[in-house]
C-alpha cells in the first residue's frame, strides 16, 4: 500500500504514468486520515485496509514526522536518506539506507 501525505489523485497519476498503478493494492492519500503525520492515522488506516496488523507492515519514509507516525503506530520504519535529510538523526528507525538504490540492492540480495 501507499500511505502518503499527498493527495490520492496525485499518487495515482504518478503511478499511472509509471505503469505501476496495478501493482499497488491500496492507495491512501492525505484525505484518508483525520490527522496528518506525525499522527499515526494514515499508517493505521493502511494496515486496516490491507487487513493486517500494523506490526506486520513496514513504512518507508524520508521524514522525521513520518518516522514518528510509524513509531506511534507500532510499525517498523525504514528511512531512505536524500540530500535534504542526511543530517537528521533517525535514531528510532529500524534501518537507514543512504538511498533508494541501496534499499533496492538490499532487497535483491
Give the role of each language-model region.
Residues 4-6:
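Conserved phosphate-coupling serine/threonine residues in phosphotransfer and NTP-handling enzymes
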